[in-house]
């Protein structure tokens, strides 16, 4: 019977500890390590332990979800920035492409004109008298070159 008296006394002490243990705030509950949490949960009923552990799990999941949302927003902003940069690059390349096509068309026209001239010369022979053109070369001095730049 002494053992029964001792065990009932131990249960009474545990209940008293559970009743006297201050409740943990949400911040404290999340900040505790598992070892510290288990130390705080000693003497509490199984239901109370389960309730506090579930509360801790819920709070931690809420924190993880919030950080995930922040990360997703940051990634979205970064992707939008990259998209704008790529759209700008595509526009720039389209303008360069259009300019090169224009230059290509101009060169193609000159090439076709030269081919036509070559065919004419080949079919009729060289012209009897070719008009020569004078070529004037203008050399710019350093001072004049700065004025033209």
Curated annotation (Swiss-Prot):
Signal peptide start-end: none
Annotated transmembrane regions: none
InterPro entries documented for this protein: bZIP, bZIP_Maf, bZIP_sf, TF_DNA-bd_sf, Transcription_factor_Maf_fam
Free-text function comment from the UniProt entry: Since it lacks a putative transactivation domain, it may behave as a transcriptional repressor when it dimerizes among itself. May also serve as a transcriptional activator by dimerizing with other (usually larger) basic-zipper proteins and recruiting them to specific DNA-binding sites. May be involved in the cellular stress response.
Cellular component GO terms held in the UniProt record: nucleus
PROSITE patterns, per the entry: BZIP
Disulfide partners: none
Any one GO molecular-function label of the UniProt entry: DNA-binding transcription factor activity, RNA polymerase II-specific
Description of how the protein assembles with itself and partners: Monomer and homo- or heterodimer.
Any GO BP: regulation of transcription by RNA polymerase II
Pfam family, one: bZIP_Maf
Similarity comment text for this entry: Belongs to the bZIP family. Maf subfamily.
bZIP domain: residues covered: 51-114
Localization (cell): Nucleus
Gene name in the database record: MAFF
Name this polypeptide is given: Transcription factor MafF
């Amino acid at each position: 019977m002494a053992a029964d008296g001792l065990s009932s006394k131990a249960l009474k002490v545990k209940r008293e500890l559970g009743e006297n243990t201050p409740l943990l705030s949400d911040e404290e509950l999340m900040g505790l390590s598992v070892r510290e949490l288990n130390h705080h949960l000693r003497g509490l009923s199984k239901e109370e332990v389960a309730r506090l552990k579930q509360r801790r799990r819920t709070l931690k999941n809420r924190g993880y979800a919030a950080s995930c949302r922040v990360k997703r927003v940051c990634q979205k902003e970064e992707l939008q920035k990259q998209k704008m940069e790529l759209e700008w690059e595509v526009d720039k390349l389209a303008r360069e492409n259009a300019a090169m096509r224009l230059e290509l068309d101009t060169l193609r026209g000159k090439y076709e004109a030269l081919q036509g001239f070559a065919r004419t010369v080949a079919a009729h022979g060289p012209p009897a008298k070719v008009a020569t053109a004078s070529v004037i070369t203008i050399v710019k001095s350093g001072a004049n070159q700065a004025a033209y730049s």
